[in-house]
UniProtKB/Swiss-Prot annotation:
Glycans are attached at residues 591, 596, 609, 617. One of its GO terms (molecular function) is sodium:bicarbonate symporter activity. Keywords: Cell membrane, Glycoprotein, Ion transport, Membrane, Sodium, Sodium transport, Symport, Transmembrane, Transmembrane helix, Transport. This is Electrogenic sodium bicarbonate cotransporter 1. InterPro entries: Band3_cytoplasmic_dom, HCO3_transpt-like_TM_dom, HCO3_transpt_euk, Na/HCO3_transpt, PTrfase/Anion_transptr. One of its GO terms (cellular component) is basolateral plasma membrane. Homodimer. Electrogenic sodium/bicarbonate cotransporter with a Na(+):HCO3(-) stoichiometry varying from 1:2 to 1:3. May regulate bicarbonate influx/efflux at the basolateral membrane of cells and regulate intracellular pH. It is a multi-pass membrane protein. Expressed in kidney and to a lower extent in bladder, brain, intestine, large intestine and eye. Residues 1-421, 476, 527-540, 667-681, 764-775, 812-833, 875-916, 943-1035 are cytoplasmic. The lineage of its organism: Eukaryota, Metazoa, Chordata, Craniata, Vertebrata. Residues 192-217 have a biased composition (Polar residues).
Length: 1035
C-alpha cells in the first residue's frame, strides 16, 4: 500500500513540475475521470483530486465558509474604500443598486470566460498556503514581499499597494424599520444610486446603510456592529471566513494577484461583515478599465469557495497545482446556458432540495457508494432493512433480546436529557390529546361490546400503565401504544362466545392473554423478529395506508353520526316562528296532567321554582319537563318544533374542518414568508395545540351547545360486577384454561404483526434514528404488559401506527443555521423517553382533570383525528403513485422511479397495491376481521409472488428487494466487479458500460494566451488569430 502511495506521489510531483508548461498550452478539463472518447488514460488532474480527497485524515471535516466580496470603490465621491458588494454561504446575495437592502439569495450565474481567467490568476499569482500570520498588515506585508522577490511587483509600488489594501472597509448592514427623522433626512439627501457608472467605468457608492471601519489601527477584535449582526444566526459556530478583495487602481501596469490560506483562522478586526475568523484571502488589484472583469473574477472565486468539493480541495491543497485541479473539476461539472435562450440578468431561485455533493466526492475518494457499470441495486436511503443489525438472527437463546439491551443501555441516560427542548412540550400536548381521544373512543366502543366489563376508565388506566412502562423501558420509546381495531373485534367476539357458552368472560380472557404472552416470549427467545426483514415497502405502506384511511373514515363517520343525533331542520322558516311550538304530554292522555313526584324524585332533581312549589302536592306539571326528562319518563313530544336543533351540526362541522385546516396551515407555517424564523418554528411546533385552543375559544364565544369531551370523574371499575383483579381459577372448567391457547395463537399473530410492522415504519432509514431499534425488546415488554392487563381486566395494547408516526413528525429536528436560500436540512428525530412517558402519565391523570377537559368539543378532537390520518400519508410513495393515475405524463413529477421504470409497470404495481388494500378494507369491515393479522401476513406472500411479474430492477425502485440467502455471496461478486469496473458519475442514467480505462480531454488555450492578460487588446488582433479548428484540423 505504501509503495502505491509513493508511486502516486512521484507521479503527482512530476505533474507539478510540468504543470505550468502544460497549463499554458492547454486547459485540462477532467471528464469525471472517464468521460473522454479519445484517450484511455486517467488525467493527472483527476488523479490529483482523487489523491487529495481520498487521503486518510483523522482531522474533523472542514468548517462552513462565509465568503465576502469587497470591491475598491469611491464612496460619495470621497476616498477609495473597500465596499462589501456580495456575500455567499451557499447562494449569492448582492447589495441591490439602491444600496438599501440585500437581494434575495439566488444561484450565482458565472461567465465561462471569468472562470478561465480565474484559473490563469491562480496559475500566475502568488499562492501562499498555511501562512502563519495574526493580522492583516502582517499578511499584506508577506504577500507584497513575496511578489517583489518573484519579480511580479516593483519595489517602489510596495507603499501604494499596502496603503490600498489597508483602506477602510464598509459593510452592508440592516437597520430597523423605525428610523429617526435624522436618518430619513440623510437617506433623502444622498439619493445617488449604488452602482452609477461614470465615464471611466468605475462604480461609485452611496453612503446609506454602510458601516465604515479603518484597519489602520490594526484592531483584531470585532466591533460592535459585527457583534450585533443578526446574520450570525445563519452561520454554524465553527464557521470561518473567506475574503475576496478586488479592485482597479491607477498605479499598476499588470495585475496584483494573491491567494492566501492561513495556518490558523484569525480574527482580522472588522475585515468581515460578521465576527468570524478569516481562513482564506483572495486579492486581485489591476489596472484601470477592467472593473467588470475584476468583479466577475471575484464572483467566480467566491462561488467556488461556496462549492462543497472545491471548498474541501482548498482546505487540503498542498500546492498551486492542487488548486488548479480543483478549478478544472469545477469546470468539468459546470453547466453552460446558451446566451440566446437565457437572460443572465434573471436571478435563479434556489432549488428546494440541493443535489448531494457526495457523488462527486466519492468519485474521487474511492467511496463504496459508487455504482459500477449500472449493476448495483437502487437505494434511495429509505430502502429495505434486511441488512439492519437489529434484525440479524443470533441463533442463541434470547440472543436478539440481549443485543437489544446492550444496544439501548448506553443511551438510557441521554434518553432523558435529550428531551430538554420546547419542541418536546408541543409534542406532549399534541400526542396527549390524540391519546385521550383514542382512549375515550375505544373505551366507549369496548364498553358497548362487553356490556361495560371494560369501559372508558379501564381504557384510561390501561393506556397510562402500558404506555408509561413501555416508553420507559421499551426498545423504541418513540412508539406509542394504543388499542386497535382488530383487538376490539376480537374482544367483541370473545365476549359473545363466553356469553353464549356460560363462560366467565374475564377469566377466559385472562388465560388467553397469558397464553398469548407466553407465545410472544417464545418468539422473543427465538429471535423471530428477524422475519421483519421480509416486510418490504409494499407491506409497510399497505398497512400504514390502511390505518390512515381508517382514521380518516372514522373521523367523518363520527361527524355523520353526530349529525344524525342533532339533525338539521331544513324546513324551518324564520317567518313562521310564531307557529312553531313543542310541548310534553303524559304517556297516557286519559290520565291527569299531573305526575307522581316520588318516582321522579328518586332519579332527578328539578331546578325550576314551579316544581318546588308543587312538590308539596307530590306532583309536577309535564309541561315543565325538559326534552330529555320528558323522553326519559315516557312522555310524548308534540309540536312542529320538537325536532329542531339550533346550529349544532353546522357548528360541529365548522369546528371539525376548521381544526383540521388550521392544523395543516400552521404546521406548514415554518416555510412561509411571514414573521422571523424563530416565530415561524414555534408556531409550527405548536400548530395542533394552537388550532385546538382557537376553536375551543370559538366554541365558547358562540355558546352553541356542541357535544363535549366526557371523562370519567370517579376512579372505579365501569361495571359494579367486577374488581381490579381477575382470579385465574374457579370461574370456568379446567379444560378451558388449556383450550385458551388456540384463540391465543390468533392474538399472538395480531400482536406480532401490529407491533413489528409499526416498529419497522418507525425505524425506517429516512427518519435518521441514531440510537438503534429494539424489535425483540419491544415485543418482550408488550408480552409482559399483556400479562398485567389480563390480570387487571384492562384492554390489551400494541403499537399504534398513525399516532406513532404523528409522534415522530412532532419531534423532527432540522438545522438551526441554514444558509440564506437553503431549505433547512432534516437532521433526524429527537429520540428520548420523556414525551411518551409524560403523555401516558397525563392520560392516567385525566380522570382528575375532568373539570378542564369537559370544555373541549368532540368535533375539535375529531378534526385532530382527521389531521393525524392525512398527515401520516405524507411522503408515502403509494400515495404519490396513486396521484400519477390522474396526471398526464408531461405533468408528472420527476420521481426517480419514473426515470427507470416504464409507466405502465408503475401503474400495474399501484393497481395490485390498491386491490390488496381494498380486500383488507372489506375484510376488516366484516365479522372475519378477526383474521385481519393473518391477511397482513398474506401481503408478504403477495409481494413475494411479484418477483415473477416484475424484474428485480423495477422492484428495486418501486419497492425494497427481498433479502436472499446468498446475498453475501452476490455482494462479494459485486465487489470483485467494482475492482475491475470503471467509475462514472452518470452511470446511473445510462445502461451502457464505459471503457475500463479513464481518459481526459485537453482543450488548447492558445486563444487565451494570444490575448494579453487582463489588459486591453484590439479587436483586430483577435480577429486575425487562428481559430481552434484552423489550428487543430487533425481533430
Amino acid at each position: 500500500m505504501s509503495s502505491e502511495k509513493e508511486c502516486l506521489e512521484n507521479m503527482l510531483n512530476g505533474y507539478a513540475e510540468s504543470g505550468r508548461v502544460l497549463s499554458r498550452t492547454s486547459l485540462v478539463i477532467n471528464q469525471a475521470v472517464n468521460r473522454s472518447i479519445f484517450t484511455s488514460t486517467v488525467s493527472p488532474a483527476a488523479e490529483r483530486i482523487r489523491f487529495i480527497l481520498g487521503e486518510e485524515d483523522d482531522s474533523p471535516a472542514p468548517p462552513q465558509l462565509f465568503t465576502e466580496l469587497d470591491e475598491l470603490l469611491a464612496v460619495d465621491g470621497q476616498e477609495m474604500e473597500w465596499k462589501e458588494t456580495a456575500r455567499w454561504i451557499k447562494f449569492e446575495e448582492k447589495v441591490e443598486q439602491g444600496g438599501e437592502r440585500w437581494s434575495k439569495p439566488h444561484v450565482a450565474t458565472l461567465s465561462l470566460h471569468s472562470l478561465f481567467e480565474l484559473r490563469t490568476c491562480i496559475e500566475k499569482g502568488t499562492i501562499l498556503l498555511d501562512l502563519e500570520a495574526t493580522s492583516l498588515p502582517q499578511i499584506v506585508e508577506i504577500v507584497i514581499n513575496n511578489q517583489i522577490e518573484l519579480g511580479l511587483l516593483k519595489a517602489d509600488m510596495k507603499e501604494n499597494v499596502t496603503r490600498t489594501l489597508l483602506r477602510k472597509h464598509r459593510h452592508q448592514t440592516k437597520k430597523s424599520n423605525l428610523r429617526s427623522l435624522a436618518d430619513i433626512g440623510k437617506t433623502v439627501s444622498s439619493a445617488s444610486r449604488l452602482f452609477s457608472t461614470p465615464d471611466n467605468g468605475s462604480p461609485t457608492m452611496t453612503h446609506r446603510n454602510l458601516t465604515s471601519t479603518s484597519l489602520n489601527d490594526v484592531s483584531d477584535k470585532p466591533d460592535k456592529e459585527q457583534l450585533k449582526n443578526k446574520f450570525m444566526k445563519k452561520l454554524p459556530r465553527d464557521a470561518e471566513a473567506s475574503n475576496v478583495l478586488v479592485g482597479e487602481v491607477d498605479f499598476l501596469e499588470s495585475p496584483f494577484i494573491a491567494f492566501v490560506r492561513l495556518q490558523q483562522a484569525v480574527m482580522l478586526g472588522s475585515l468581515t461583515e460578521v465576527p468570524v475568523p478569516t481562513r482564506f484571502l483572495f486579492i486581485l488589484l489591476g489596472p484601470k478599465g477592467k472593473a467588470k472583469s475584476y468583479h466577475e473574477i471575484g464572483r467566480s472565486i467566491a462561488t467556488l469557495m461556496s462549492d462543497e468539493v472545491f471548498h474541501d480541495i482548498a482546505y487540503k491543497a498542498k500546492n498551486r497545482e492542487d488548486l488548479i485541479a480543483g478549478i478544472d473539476e469545477f469546470l468539468d461539472e459546470v453547466i453552460v446556458l446558451p446566451l440566446g435562450e437565457w437572460d443572465p440578468t434573471i436571478r435563479i431561485e434556489p432549488p428546494k432540495s440541493l443535489p448531494s455533493s457526495d457523488k462527486r466526492k466519492n468519485m474521487y475518494s474511492g467511496g463504496d457508494n459508487l455504482q459500477m457499470n449500472g449493476d448495483a441495486p437502487h437505494d434511495d436511503g429509505g430502502g429495505g432493512h434486511g441488512d439492519s443489525e437489529e434484525l440479524q438472527r443470533t441463533g442463541r437463546f434470547c440472543g436478539g433480546l440481549i443485543k437489544d439491551i446492550q444496544r439501548k443501555a448506553p443511551f438510557f441516560a441521554s434518553d432523558f436529557y435529550d428531551a430538554l427542548s420546547i419542541q418536546s412540550l408541543s409534542a406532549i400536548l399534541f400526542i396527549y390529546l390524540g391519546t385521550v381521544t383514542n382512549a375515550i373512543t375505544f373505551g366507549g366502543l369496548l364498553g358497548d361490546a362487553t356490556e361495560n366489563m371494560q369501559g372508558v376508565l379501564e381504557s384510561f388506566l390501561g393506556t397510562a400503565v402500558s404506555g408509561a412502562v413501555f416508553c420507559l423501558f421499551g426498545g423504541q420509546p418513540l412508539t406509542i401504544l394504543s388499542s386497535t381495531g382488530p383487538v376490539l373485534v376480537f374482544e367483541r367476539l370473545l365476549f359473545n362466545f363466553s356469553k353464549d357458552n356460560d363462560f366467565d368472560y374475564l377469566e377466559f380472557r385472562l388465560w388467553i392473554g397469558l397464553w398469548s404472552a407466553f407465545q410472544c416470549l417464545i418468539l422473543v427467545a427465538t429471535d423471530a423478529s428477524f422475519l421483519v426483514k421480509y416486510f418490504t415497502r409494499f407491506t409497510e405502506e399497505g398497512f400504514s395506508s390502511l390505518i390512515s384511511f381508517i382514521f380518516i373514515y372514522d373521523a367523518f363517520k363520527k361527524m355523520i353520526k353526530l349529525a344524525d343525533y342533532y339533525p338539521i331542520n331544513s324546513h324551518f322558516k324564520v317567518d313562521y316562528i310564531t307557529q312553531y311550538s313543542c310541548a310534553c304530554f303524559p304517556p297516557e292522555p286519559a290520565n291527569s296532567s299531573w305526575f307522581n313526584m316520588t318516582t321522579a324524585a328518586t332519579t332527578t332533581q328539578f331546578l325550576t321554582n314551579a316544581s318546588t312549589d308543587m312538590a308539596y302536592n307530590g306532583t309536577i306539571d309535564w309541561s315543565l319537563l325538559s326534552k330529555k326528562e320528558c323522553l326519559k319518563y315516557g312522555g310524548l313530544l308534540v309540536g312542529s318544533n320538537c325536532k329542531y336543533v339550533p346550529d349544532i351540526t353546522l357548528m360541529s362541522f365548522i369546528l371539525f374542518l376548521g381544526t383540521y385546516t388550521c392544523s395543516m396551515a400552521l404546521k406548514k407555517f415554518k416555510t412561509s414568508r411571514y414573521f422571523p424564523t424563530t416565530a415561524r418554528k414555534l408556531i409550527s411546533d405548536f400548530a395542533i395545540i394552537l388550532s385546538i385552543l382557537i376553536f375551543c375559544g370559538l366554541d365558547a364565544l358562540l355558546g352553541v351547545d356542541t357535544p363535549k369531551l366526557i371523562v370519567p370523574s370517579e376512579f372505579k371499575p365501569t361495571s359494579p360486577n367486577r374488581g381490579w383483579f381477575v382470579p385465574p381459577f374457579g370461574g370456568n372448567p379446567w379444560w378451558v384454561y388449556l383450550a385458551a391457547a388456540i384463540p391465543a395463537l390468533l392474538v399472538t399473530i395480531l400482536i406480532f404483526m401490529d407491533q413489528q410492522i409499526t416498529g419497522v415504519i418507525v425505524n425506517r432509514k429516512e427518519h435518521k434514528l441514531k440510537k438503534g431499534a429494539g424489535y425483540h425488546l419491544d415485543l418482550f415488554w408488550v408480552a409482559i404488559l399483556m400479562v398485567v392487563c389480563s390480570f387487571m381486566a384492562l384492554p390489551w395494547y400494541v403499537a399504534a401506527t398513525v399516532i406513532s408516526i404523528a409522534h415522530i413528525d412532532s419531534l423532527k429536528m432540522e438545522t438551526e443555521t441554514s444558509a440564506p436560500g437553503e431549505q433547512p436540512k432534516f437532521l433526524g428525530v429527537r429520540e428520548q423517553r420523556v414525551t411518551g412517558t409524560v403523555v401516558f402519565l397525563l392520560t392516567g391523570l385525566s380522570v382528575f382533570m375532568a373539570p378542564i377537559l369537559k370544555f373541549i368539543p368532540m368535533p375539535v378532537l375529531y378534526g385532530v383525528f382527521l389531521y393525524m390520518g392525512v398527515a401520516s400519508l405524507n411522503g408515502v410513495q403509494f400515495m404519490d403513485r396513486l396521484k400519477l393515475l390522474l396526471m398526464p405524463p408531461k405533468y408528472q413529477p420527476d420521481f426517480i422511479y419514473l426515470r427507470h421504470v416504464p409507466l405502465r409497470r408503475v401503474h400495474l404495481f399501484t393497481f395490485l397495491q390498491v386491490v390488496c388494500l381494498a380486500m383488507l378494507w372489506i375484510l376488516k369491515s366484516t365479522v372475519a376481521a378477526i383474521i385481519f393479522p393473518v391477511m397482513i401476513l398474506a401481503l408478504v406472500a403477495v409481494r413475494k409472488a411479484m418477483d415473477y411479474f416484475f424484474s428485480q430492477h423495477d422492484l428495486s425502485f418501486l419497492d425494497d428487494v427481498i433479502p436472499e440467502k446468498d446475498k453475501k455471496k452476490k455482494e462479494d461478486e459485486k465487489k470483485k466487479k467494482k475492482k475491475k469496473g470503471s467509475i462514472d458519475s452518470d452511470v446511473e442514467d445510462s445502461d451502457c458500460p464505459y471503457p475500463e480505462k479513464v481518459p481526459s480531454i485537453k482543450i488548447p488555450m492558445d486563444i487565451m494566451e494570444k490575448e494579453p492578460f487582463l489588459i486591453d487588446s484590439k479587436p483586430s488582433d483577435r480577429e486575425n488569430s487562428p481559430t481552434f479548428l484552423e489550428r487543430h484540423t487533425s481533430c
